[in-house]
Amino acid sequence: MSTHLRKLPGLLLCLLLALPAWYLGRLFPIIGAPVFAILLGMLLALFYHHRDKTKEGISFTSKYILQTAVVLLGFGLNLTQVMAVGMQSLPIIISTIATALLVAYGLQKWLRLDVNTATLVGIGSSICGGSAIAATAPVIKAKDDEVAKAISVIFLFNMLAALLFPSLGQLLGLSNEGFAIFAGTAVNDTSSVTATATAWDALHHSNTLDGATIVKLTRTLAILPITLGLSLYRAKKEHDIVTEENFSLRKSFPRFILFFLLASLITTLMTSLGVSADSFHSLKTLSKFFIVMAMAAIGLNTNLVKLIKTGGQAILLGSICWVAITLVSLAMQLSLGIW
């Protein structure tokens, strides 16, 4: 059997799990399709032990379909629009990202949490949830159970943010503009930002959704420097251990991140030439679906019992990151005179 045909059974299995997960994600956007995909994968893994025929396809999906999803994610970024509208929120974005990364790095040893999970929780909390985790996992060579743990933590605090933040913003007296920045900087995943801003708009008959989404997209750009920095650090560390040869920047750069940037530049150029942003909608949708397929594969490679037993430290780290990001976002708004 050829290499491609050997991958087919595993690919089809991930596709079959992704379809109901996608549907459930549409019904319950506050949870999201990637979380349903991981759950379905983990539940099936409890009973599906003899997977010789599907092993290659599952591995291919969790790695290469995931990287393809990140590349396609670039077609959702119009850099001109993001830079024009998102610049006001840039100091807050930088502050919240730096806070989450410092908290994750500082508490990793104290919580006795593995480095990869702590890194994924910090990056997922500060940049763009599941998409940031999807982009970072291949760079740091994270194991599937580490990815599943981080995604689960992000989901928990996404849900809490969507439920609590509209009432919190009202209690604090945030303006519509202030809440758009708050939701865009303090909520992790795009779907949860949408849910949070929509709930605020329903309460106040306003339109914060567009502003919150653009702030969120501006945060997404941080994927580029963060993943590049991590890939260089990891490659240099591995190089120093293995060999004394000169370090190669070109070899250490993750190609799929380069293609992500290229996709963003293509989108920016085409829209500046008058092409409608809706033209890229199908590619953005395909990106989201590929992430769901990859999460199904990751779920299939994750031990649910082990995840439950060892997930406490990751949840604690996620909660501290979440509170820290929330406080810094509000404090920066106060210092900049937005709140």
UniProtKB/Swiss-Prot annotation:
Recorded GO CC terms: plasma membrane
A Pfam family matched in the record: Cons_hypoth698
Superkingdom in the source lineage: Bacteria
Sequence intervals crossing the membrane: 7-24, 28-50, 57-79, 84-106, 118-140, 150-172, 256-275, 290-307, 314-336
Membrane topology, from the record: Multi-pass membrane protein
Subcellular location(s) per record: Cell membrane
Keywords: Cell membrane, Membrane, Transmembrane, Transmembrane helix
Main location: membrane
PANTHER family: INNER MEMBRANE PROTEIN YEIH-RELATED, UPF0324 MEMBRANE PROTEIN FN0533
Family: Belongs to the UPF0324 family.
Name of the protein in question: UPF0324 membrane protein SpyM3_0740
